[in-house]
């Protein structure tokens, strides 16, 4: 808004042969400010008892929606995990072998180790397979609603199978 006003004033000054008194004398004051508009909007909504729009309770959860949220969550978690691992490798004393020996000395059962490995690899596999799904969308493939659900199920099955395979190693 201010840029438009400055452009108008500048053009008017150029037309008036750089006469500053004509520019100031013919300037049009603004009707309302953004703050006044915002206050009027919120007062109107509060007065009519409207909920915030769109209200979160009107959405029904669907597979593509849940998978999109989980894809973002796994991306954040993997990013944080890699950063935490890198910082701990730099700051903690000792080397990787000493920490591996520490874990081996705890005598954890194979079921617990397999479960922990599965829990570590599952977000990576989910983010990888769902990322490939997103790349297919970038190519314009699989964008129809039935295909969204089919590819979602394929991603979940591939995630579980590849996670189990990697955890078994």
Swiss-Prot record:
Q: Which compartments is it annotated to reside in?
A: Mitochondrion inner membrane
- Membrane-spanning intervals of the chain: 66-90, 111-139, 147-167
Which residues bind heme b per the record? 127
> Which residue ranges are assigned to the Mitochondrial intermembrane compartment in the record's topology?
91-110, 168-169
Give the domain of life.
Eukaryota
- Pathway it belongs to? Carbohydrate metabolism; tricarboxylic acid cycle
Q: PANTHER family from the entry?
A: SUCCINATE DEHYDROGENASE CYTOCHROME B560 SUBUNIT, SUCCINATE DEHYDROGENASE CYTOCHROME B560 SUBUNIT, MITOCHONDRIAL
Disease affiliated with this protein: Pheochromocytoma/paraganglioma syndrome 3: A form of pheochromocytoma/paraganglioma syndrome, a tumor predisposition syndrome characterized by the development of neuroendocrine tumors, usually in adulthood. Pheochromocytomas are catecholamine-producing tumors that arise from chromaffin cells in the adrenal medulla. Paragangliomas develop from sympathetic paraganglia in the thorax, abdomen, and pelvis, as well as from parasympathetic paraganglia in the head and neck. PPGL3 inheritance is autosomal dominant.
Subunit note = Component of complex II composed of four subunits: the flavoprotein (FP) SDHA, iron-sulfur protein (IP) SDHB, and a cytochrome b560 composed of SDHC and SDHD.
Q: What is the similarity comment for this entry?
A: Belongs to the cytochrome b560 family.
What's the protein name?
A: Succinate dehydrogenase cytochrome b560 subunit, mitochondrial
Q: State the organism named in the record.
A: Homo sapiens
């Amino acid at each position: 808004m201010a840029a438009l006003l400055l452009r108008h004033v500048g053009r008017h000054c150029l037309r008036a042969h750089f006469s500053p008194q004509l520019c100031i004398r013919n300037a049009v004051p603004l009707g309302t400010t953004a703050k006044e508009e915002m206050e009027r909007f919120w007062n109107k909504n509060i007065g009519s008892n409207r909920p915030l729009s769109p209200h979160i309770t009107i959405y029904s959860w669907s597979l593509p929606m849940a998978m999109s949220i989980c894809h973002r969550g796994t991306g954040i978690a993997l990013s944080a995990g890699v950063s935490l691992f890198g910082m701990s490798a730099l700051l903690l004393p000792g080397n990787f072998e000493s920490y591996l020996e520490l874990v081996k000395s705890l005598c954890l059962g194979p079921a617990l180790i397999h479960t922990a490995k599965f829990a570590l690899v599952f977000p990576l596999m989910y983010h990888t397979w769902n990322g490939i799904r997103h790349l297919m969308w970038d190519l314009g493939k699989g964008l129809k609603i039935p295909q969204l659900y089919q590819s979602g199920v394929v991603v979940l099955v591939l995630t579980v199978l590849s996670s189990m395979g990697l955890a078994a190693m």
